[in-house]
């Protein structure tokens, strides 16, 4: 419209990204009335019954986008109170590409909650190192460069995936971060490098799990306005590249 001179105000965005819907199973009683998930119970995940009448079997319908008319909705306030807002955000963004529908599941919600608990345990361990509660050899060596390289490369991955709306891939990147940092914490050296890299990691976590990231930054006494970390391009270069060779269909 702005380019066609229909409006004087320039539009703030180049385009609209339409995300998929959040879906849930549908349930009906024997009289064909819709039932809310809270009205349904199951002991084996296969057979469902009404909570107020365990003798009445529930008809499980197809998975459809959440709607009040079909009563297949989840109360956001209840879920947030139980698991926290960050867990909900993490689950919704991790399940599938944003243009695809997301199937709501209690198991997926619990998995996201547990992952944030693991990140919190990792944070406490790193904080203990920075506070001298865990002794390390505080000097620069090849481990410092490995830490710098991993952190810069993962930040670049997350930056690229954010620009492409690949939120589910970003969550996979978060698991890479956890696996690396939890494995390498016992080998960490040079506290300045640890703190600088970890703060940058918290910055790239913040779009997805902002409350967790902000709490961790607060505990590290980072009170200034945080900015998206700049990548040092020298760490993006690979000295070694693994090439798979196949001869007659077999890897050599």
Where are these regions (language model features)?
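Conserved phosphate-binding loops in nucleotide/dinucleotide-binding enzymes
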Residues: 27-85, 99-110, 234-236
């Amino acid at each position: 419209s702005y380019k066609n001179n229909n409006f004087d105000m320039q539009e703030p965005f180049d385009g609209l990204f339409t995300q998929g819907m959040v879906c849930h199973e549908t349930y009906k009683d024997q009289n064909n009335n819709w039932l809310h998930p809270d009205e349904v119970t199951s002991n084996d995940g296969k057979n469902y019954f009404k909570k107020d009448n365990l003798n009445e079997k529930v008809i499980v319908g197809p998975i459809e986008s959440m709607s009040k008319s079909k009563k297949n909705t989840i109360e956001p306030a209840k879920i947030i109170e139980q698991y926290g807002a960050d867990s909900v955000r993490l689950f919704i963004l991790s399940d599938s590409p944003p243009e695809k529908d997301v199937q709501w599941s209690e198991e997926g919600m619990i998995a996201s909650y547990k992952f944030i608990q693991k990140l919190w345990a990792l944070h406490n361990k790193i904080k203990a190192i920075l506070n001298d509660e865990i002794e390390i050899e505080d000097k620069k060596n090849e481990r410092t460069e490995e830490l710098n390289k991993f952190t810069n490369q993962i930040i670049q991955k997350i930056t690229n995936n954010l620009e492409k709306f690949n939120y589910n891939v970003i969550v996979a990147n978060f698991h890479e971060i956890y696996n690396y940092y939890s494995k390498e914490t016992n080998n960490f050296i040079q506290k300045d490098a640890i703190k600088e890299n970890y703060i940058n990691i918290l910055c790239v976590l913040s779009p997805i799990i902002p409350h967790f990231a902000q709490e961790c930054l607060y505990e590290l006494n980072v009170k200034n306005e945080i900015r998206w970390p700049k990548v040092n391009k020298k760490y993006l270069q690979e000295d070694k590249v693994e090439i798979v060779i196949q001869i007659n269909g077999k890897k050599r």
